Structures are given as C-alpha cells and as structure tokens.
Amino acid sequence: MWFFARDPVRDFPFELIPEPPEGGLPGPWALHRGRKKATGSPVSIFVYDVKPGAEEQTQVAKAAFKRFKTLRHPNILAYIDGLETEKCLHVVTEAVTPLGIYLKARVEAGGLKELEISWGLHQIVKALSFLVNDCSLIHNNVCMAAVFVDRAGEWKLGGLDYMYSAQGNGGGPPRKGIPELEQYDPPELADSSGRVVREKWSADMWRLGCLIWEVFNGPLPRAAALRNPGKIPKTLVPHYCELVGANPKVRPNPARFLQNCRAPGGFMSNRFVETNLFLEEIQIKEPAEKQKFFQELSKSLDAFPEDFCRHKVLPQLLTAFEFGNAGAVVLTPLFKVGKFLSAEEYQQKIIPVVVKMFSSTDRAMRIRLLQQMEQFIQYLDEPTVNTQIFPHVVHGFLDTNPAIREQTVKSMLLLAPKLNEANLNVELMKHFARLQAKDEQGPIRCNTTVCLGKIGSYLSASTRHRVLTSAFSRATRDPFAPSRVAGVLGFAATHNLYSMNDCAQKILPVLCGLTVDPEKSVRDQAFKAIRSFLSKLESVSEDPTQLEEVEKDVHAASSPGMGGAAASWAGWAVTGVSSLTSKLIRSHPTTAPTETNIPQRPTPEGVPAPAPTPVPATPTTSGHWETQEEDKDTAEDSSTADRWDDEDWGSLEQEAESVLAQQDDWSTGGQVSRASQVSNSDHKSSKSPESDWSSWEAEGSWEQGWQEPSSQEPPPDGTRLASEYNWGGPESSDKGDPFATLSARPSTQPRPDSWGEDNWEGLETDSRQVKAELARKKREERRREMEAKRAERKVAKGPMKLGARKLD
C-alpha cells in the first residue's frame, strides 16, 4: 500500500532555508540555517545524507544523533528536534554559527575582545568538566569545528560524533578517518605499547590547548606550532603550557584548570565572567545581592558585547522587573541596553515594561522614569501616552516631594507633542496654574513658567490667547527673582503668538513695570524684551502691510515646528533646579553658582531681536536659589539636608517683604497698591467653581506676602501718600478731571476659568488709594499688637538674665 505512505521530511515541523551549508565542517554533518514552520523562529539544522558504502560514517552520525537527544547542559549545543529516515538524519538545534566563522567576522568588524574569549573558553572548559567528571565521557573531538556560538555570543560545545565512555564499557574510541580531525590527537595516542600513564581527561585537555592556540593564532598548521604561544595572553600562557605538555599525567582536570584561571589576576578573573556567572545563578540570589548587582551593572555594559547585552542581559532585566522586586535599579541598565535594539524590538520588549512602571507607586522608580524619559519617548505612540502614561504622570504634580514635582514639569516638554486636546489644553493647564500660583518652591514655579513658554506653540489658539499673557504676567509678580526673569523670557519666546494690540495694551505695561524691579537681572531682561516688542510695533506702524505677516501665528493651529523653535529660547531657565533631585540623593550642598548664557528665540524677519546676554547666576544655579530661599537667621543641620518633609526651604512671604522694602527706593507706594490690588482681585475670582484648578489669577496666595510687609515702619503722622496729591490742578477746584472718563477703565469680572485679562490693568485710581491706606493702617495695627504681646510676655516671665531665660 505504497500510496498510503507519507514523506516524513515534508511533515517535519522545520524547514531548511535554501542556502549553501555554513562552514564546511570536517566530519559527516553539514550545517544549514532553518526555521520553524509554525512561527518562523530561526534554528540550525545538522543534516547527514546516507550514502551507499559509508556504513562507518553512518554509524558515527547515528551515535551523535543519540548523544544529542540524551545530553542536556547549558554549555552543550541544545537539541530541539530530530528526524531519522533511511535516506537522511536531521538534528535541529538552537540557532548557532561555527566558531571559526564567528571569530573571523568579529575580527573584521574590529570588535573581538579578550573578555568574550575568556568567557567562551570558560564555557567550553565547563562543558568538558561536566562530561568527564559527571558523565565519565570522553569528548574525543575538541577543536574549532566542534564549537558553535549562539546569538548571545555564548560558546556551545558540539561535535559529539566520536564520544565514548571513560569506563571502557562501550569499547575504545571510534576511528575518525579524517586527517583534519586527527591532527588534534595527543602524541601519546601514537604509542601503541600502552605504557604511558594518563588520566581520563588528558586527551581532551590536549585538544583544549589546541583550541586555545587556534582561537588566538588562527588554524593550526601542525602540532609543532603549539610550542610557540604566539598571541596567547600572558596571563593564560602558564595554564596553556600545562595543557600541551608532553607528560599527560600533569595535564590538569578541567575543574582545576577553571580554578587556576579564575584566581586573582587570572585570565578568567574579570567583570564580564563575573557578570555571566551571576546571571546564571540569579534565581537563587538574595534580593540584596540582586540590588547591588543591577546597581553596578550599568557601569560595565559599555565594555560588554552588544549581542550579549541584547540577548542575555535584557531578558534577565525584564524577568527581574516582572517577577522580582528589583525596582528602580533595573531602569538604568534597561534603558542602556535599549540603545542596542531596533525600533520594532524596543516596542515589543521595553515599552510594555515602561508603561507598567508608570503605574508604580515607588517614588524612586517614578523619578527615574521621568529623568530618563528622553531615552524612550520617541518609541511611545500618542494613544499609549494619553491613555496609559499621562494619567499616571500627572500625579507627580501633586506629590509632596519637590524633586518629583520638578521632574514632572520637565517631562511635559517631551510629552506635550503627543498629548491630545483635552490633556494638553485642559488637564495640563489646570496643573500648571496651580503650580505657578501655589507651589512653595520658587524653582518649581520658575520651571513651570519656562515649560509653558516652550510648549506654548503646541497649545490651541484659544488656549494660547487665554493662558500665555496671564501666566507670564503672573510670573513677573513672583517674589522669586528667577521666576520674574522666566516670565519676561516667556513673553520673548512666544512673541509671535500675540497680536499687536495685546503687545501694546497688555504685555508692554507689564514689562515696563519690571524696569524698576529690585533685581538687575530682571530689569535687564525687561529692557531687552521692551525693545524687541517696540521694534515690532514700530515696524508695523511704518508699514501696516506687515501686520498680516507678523500676526500669522496668532490664530494658527498648534505647530510642532513652532514648538521646536520655542524650546531653544533659554534652555531650562532654572536648569540648576535639578539640585532638588540631587538633593534627594546627596546630602551635600551644591557647588557655587555659575553664569549661563540664555539665547533668545529668533524673531521674524525684519524685526530686530534682542542680543543674547548672560543671565546672572541667580536664575540659573540651584545652590543660590536654595540659599536665597532659606531663612537667613536660622542655621540648618546638615544631617537633615535630604529630609524633604522636615527641611525648611525658606519663607517666600518673608523674602517678599524684604523685596518690597527694597522696592520703596524705586517707587513710593506703587508696588504696595499694585500687590494689594492683585490680591483683592484674586480673592474675588477664587469664588468661581473652577478656581481650585483652572485659575492662574485665583491662586495667588504667595502674592499676599507682598501686601503686608511687617518690617516696614509706618510713615510719620501727617505724611501724605504721593497718590493723595491732586497733580491735575489746584486743590480748591471742585471740577472733575476732564480726562477721567478716558483714563478710567471699567473693571471686568474674570471669566469662569480665570485665565482672562489680568486685573492689574482694570482698577480705578480711587480704589488704589483706599487700599493703600487700608494696608498702611493694617501694618500699624499689626505693629501695636506685636508690642502689646511683647509687653505681656515681659510681665508674665519676669526679669530675664543675660543669655538665659528664667525658668518657670
């Protein structure tokens, strides 16, 4: 019934790739590349075609087929499947390359290192030790043709054709009959008298010496060449000489050879071998050992082969995160290995892990993800960012740890181009409004302003019109000087997003107010920005036809190209604020401040741009900010430098009062009335339903420190404020000011989202005078209360000695 017969080769689940065999191995087998039919995964297929009159070779091939199926060891070629018919033998193994071809390719690429060879020889010797000491088997074919390399660079021992038992129960060693293989036989095999005393491993260790010589010097021409070590490293030469010694009795056991080479200073005593040995036993290591290993791994990855990192280190890192408790220490080596992957491999292997990491509550992991986002952001698609990453990232805006808040703000620069309309224009702006108004850390408020300036072009036209002017105006009233600089530079960076009316009526009045700022850096930037905006206005005034060209971006949709230009306007104006992050790790103060150049955003053609000037150290160096924000009368203990919850980061209200006192030299009463006015308008707008989240103007709690400077002494009795004088005419005149109706502007209520017009330009002169007078009376009342309390304490406590208070 021959028509019921089936071709076993056709039903075999693996197929050969139609290519010539690899290598031309001496012996009965031909090595082909293949793949699994179901999945397409690559494999190697050793093929032996049965030929008439070659019974001896057929028996050798069948014996090897049997050995492949029964021997299992990490350093021996892994058997996957096999096929035995009357016409052929197929042995399917993991995908490998002959060692000779691999070494030649590595040398041509200029990437072969002694580290790779040391670990490869370690694996071959370990396989021989397993065969001789554990299985009592003699390999009898150790040579270059019997060693293969997998895709991770691991060396595997194959060539099991001529293996026999060391106990003699299976007969003597089979005859090879192949001159290419017989040249590796030790000299004692030529002595037929049998009087030579040798160990069971002696012949294989001689062949190991031949393999070492060929790895470093190329194909062995004759046995006499073994006397010259050639390019064999000096640390390996003494052990090599033991292997090729004429006396087989002194050749070391494979286990002892490994021990000798692993001694301090030995050829196999290096970081690469130690890393591989740890990875082989990582499942039984203690958690503390794993933590230490992954922490030190990043330093060594640069010296390791790329294939090893991709195919051996990466799976262990992914496993450690998925099933272990390695935590944040996995991130740094994970992203370092990720650089070796293609975009497709990165999407398949690393992105799922990254997405899962963002949902972690571990602060260390969250902050490291934010710090290293630049390495993987290009592999994230928009749906993944908006649905799986952004909802977890925004929790960082509410974190009590300043370092996490700071890194969350910075990460928005990378995420903004991938955010959808709702997340970018609604959710993100809500958090930015709260941070800029209420965050107690001046550097974080400053970086929020900087980030807004960089992502401004990604916002929708309506959001830009509603947000940018109000946000940057608020920043110019921040008591933290770098925040005021950031507000000015924010206007300059986004100058193309404002209409000429907004430039003249909203932006220039704000900038002009900063020309009398106590900080010279603020004044300098204000003057430059004013000149830039005036230049635009003047050019449009001279040639009104330029108006359309100048305002082309005002109502334009969000543009990534515009965002790229804005992103370079000043770098991170508070780049040094990363000290908040480093402060989480280090307890030592930062170094002295340095000056940083802040380049301006390029202006439209025909409009002169302000010349880039170095910004003083104050807005660019974290160490100075920390000193500026600390209470100068309080000395902190250095041991508490990294305790965020307990650390005194300074009182912005106290700092604001001292700044206000300095401002009195620039304008009498004007700053006080301005701050009072803003505070009052903020109080009104805070009653809107969305004031807790979506209001830049409603959340000005930090500005109240400008309103009540307790250190300022009240003016003498009878003193009149400058605003109380009638500068327009005689005091006895009862006529109203004929220009009053022109100068007075109706006060407008803030819109429900409170992103609208700033209230600083809408209050009348009379209300400013009344509020200034109320502020003065409030300070006087506060001073009296403090004096009364001091008097009460003196009466209650009694007399006090010099330097000590009397105990109750």
From Swiss-Prot:
Q: Where in the cell is it found?
A: Cytoplasm, Cytoskeleton, Microtubule organizing center, Centrosome; Endoplasmic reticulum-Golgi intermediate compartment; Golgi apparatus, cis-Golgi network
Q: In which tissues is it expressed?
A: Ubiquitous.
Q: Where is the composition biased (Acidic residues)?
A: 755-764
Keyword terms of this UniProt record: Activator, Coiled coil, Cytoplasm, Cytoskeleton, DNA-binding, ER-Golgi transport, Golgi apparatus, Intellectual disability, Neurodegeneration, Nucleus, Phosphoprotein, Repeat, Spinocerebellar ataxia, Transcription, Transcription regulation, Transport
Provide the positions where the record notes the PTM Phosphoserine.
S754
Q: Where is this region: Disordered?
A: 540-566, 587-646, 658-808
Q: Where is this region: Interaction with COPB1?
A: 793-808
On assembly, the entry states:
Interacts with GORAB. Interacts with COPA, COPB1 and COPB2. Homooligomer. Interacts with AP2B1.
Q: Which family does it belong to?
A: Belongs to the protein kinase superfamily.
Q: What is this protein called?
A: N-terminal kinase-like protein
Q: Which organism is it from?
A: Homo sapiens
